Structure formats: structure tokens, C-alpha cells
Amino acid sequence: MSKAKQTIHEFDLNVIYDYFSSVERQGPGSQEITLKALSFIDGLTEKSKVADIGCGTGGQTMVLAQNIPCEIIGVELWSDFINQFNQNAQNKNLHDRMKGIVGNMENLPFQEEELDLIWSEGAIYNIGFKRGLNEWRRFLKQGGYIAVTENTWFTEERPAEIQEFWQKAYSEIDTIPNKVSQMQKAGYLPIATFVVHESCWTNYYSIMQKTHASFLKKYKGNKTAEEFVSYQRYEAELYYKYKAYYGYVFYIGKKI
């Protein structure tokens, strides 16, 4: 892997978004994992309002809409993702109570205590776990829920190679007890915490691997695109090598 760029955020956003636009989910996850997390959420009705922050093209949002009767708003920075999101909702006949809007998770377009549930799979790291929990809390009604996935250490100690990679890629990565403590300090009652199964990661990396050839052909001679694919391959290699030490964890909390 090229050492020129050490984190995903150092690459051209247009290249990143184009890379992820061809897949249903832009990060590790599955219908089963989404439904497992949803099973811990109580009291949602037709009058409830849900926001999926960093929704991407809406793979997990469609699952939510098919299983709860609420109004759902997907928020995503990239307009092409939102176009796909809304087309997917139309195709699944869900557009009457869900829509995607272009927005920034640092400046969400909601009123205080407007939402009953905030959802975010594989996206809160863009603003940071602690910041996201603290800043988004005001949009939740009292007793409202937040459900997010976060890259997390499974052990107190880990090999230097993976420690160095993730400290550079996402310095807020931490252990489960520390993440739960951060949730409590942000004003939530921790409801559930569970590890996202490794099959979500292996399926995700397998799907992405299949897109590399066509992506590189599209960007033939583009050094940035080539470096980005190399970065993604390196990240996958590290996961297969060190998956015992880290992965996604679902954190579900209730505003108190």
C-alpha cells in the first residue's frame, strides 16, 4: 500500500463516493444485524419520527422502513447517494413515509426533541462517537433512542501494526467499556451492546473486491483511484489478519 495517504479522509471525496456508490451497503452490516438492533427499540408508532444519519444509499434504512411504521428521514452529504436512496424507496414502494435529504451530520436539519430514534450504521466516526452522541442528543425526545455502530477494540492490548493503523485512521477507537461509559456521560441509558458478526465484514470486503477491476478500469491511469483501491485492500488484509482484536459494535442508548 502506498504510504502517501494514511487515512480514508485524505482521498478525494468524489473518488470515495464513486467507489461506494455501486454497492447496497457502504460498510459492514446486514439485514439481520439491523433487525437485531431494532429489536431493542420500544414504543415506535406511526406518529414516531426516525432519522438515519449518514444513510448512504439506504441499505439499512430500507430494512428499518419495512419493519417499523414510522416516518423515516435519511441524511447524507453526497447527493448521488440520496438520489439512489430515493429511487430505492420508490422501487420498494416505501416513498410515502421515507425520504432521503442532502445534509451534514454536523448541522442536522431537525428541531430540538423532534425525533424518536436516531440511527447511524458505520457513519458516526465521521463526526466522532463522543461528539455525535452529545450533539445529536438534543434532537431526541425524552426517552428517545440512539443506535449506532462504532469501530471498537475487543481487547485491552493488540499488535502494534493494527494499533498504529487505527490510531491514524480513527483515533477515537476504544474498548467496549470505555464506549459505554462515553454513552452514559453523554446522557443516555445504555440499553444494549453487541458485536457485529464478522460475516458482515467478510461479505462486505468480498463485495468490494469484486468492484475493484471495473473501478480501476473506469479510472485508468488515475493515481488517486489506484491508491484508494490499494488502501482498501490493505484495510481488508488487516481485518482478516487481526479480526480477533477489533470490529464494529452496535451501541443502543436511551435519552434520559
Predicted regions and their residues:
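Conserved alpha-helix/loop element of class I SAM-dependent methyltransferases that forms part
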Residues: 27-46
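Class I SAM-dependent methyltransferase SAM/SAH-binding core
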Residues: 51-53, 57-107
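A short acidic, Gly/Pro-enriched loop at the edge of an enzyme's catalytic core
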Residues: 106-117
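A short SAM/SAH-binding and catalytic strip from SAM-dependent methyltransferases
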Residues: 117-130
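A short glycine-rich, Lys/Arg-flanked "PGG" loop and its adjoining helix->strand segment in the class I
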Residues: 131-145
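Short, glycine-/aromatic-enriched active-site segment of Class I SAM-dependent methyltransferases
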Residues: 151-170
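Short alpha-helix
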Residues: 172-187
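Conserved Class I S-adenosyl-L-methionine
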Residues: 194-256
